[in-house]
Swiss-Prot record:
It is found in: Cytoplasm. Interacts with translational regulator CsrA and flagellin(s). Acts as an anti-CsrA protein, binds CsrA and prevents it from repressing translation of its target genes, one of which is flagellin. Binds to flagellin and participates in the assembly of the flagellum. Belongs to the FliW family. The keyword Electron transport does not apply. One of its GO terms (biological process) is regulation of translation. HAMAP family: FliW. Keywords: Bacterial flagellum biogenesis, Chaperone, Cytoplasm, Translation regulation. This is Flagellar assembly factor FliW. Disulfide bonds: none annotated. One of its GO terms (cellular component) is cytoplasm. It holds the Pfam family FliW.
Amino acid sequence: MNVTTTRFGEIAVEEAKIITLPDGMLGFSEKRFVLLTPQNITPFCWLQSVENPELAFVVVDTKECASDYAVKLTAEESEKLCVNDGDEVVLLAVVTMASDPFNITVNLQGPIALNPKRMLAKQIVLEGSRYTTKHPFFDQAARSKAPGKRNASGEVTAA
């Protein structure tokens, strides 16, 4: 099937690669998406709607930004995702990009749980968790090792 996108033009997508979010993303009615992985933005991917050319989210595997991050699916969530014992569930976080890479944030309070075996996903809202919608992608240690100097507002300037 061909998918029209505003970012990548028309692309060919195998039906088997389409991810269904039965409940959609929060605030959006679209339910069918595909993960696009342009080589120039590793480790980030695009979660592109196959129904709306303009709707796409930058996402990242939560392992890339929070090594201790874990989510316990409820029985209802597991059922919606058709997760059986031993099935892999990939957790993706929606990314907010910034002109200064050290200001990139990820939404760890509303991860997307993906069952890659069934190509089913669900955005989950973690209530009462320590995670936020604006978790820094880079930790403080990475920021302090970055070349250049930081001004009072935290922006990097030439060394």
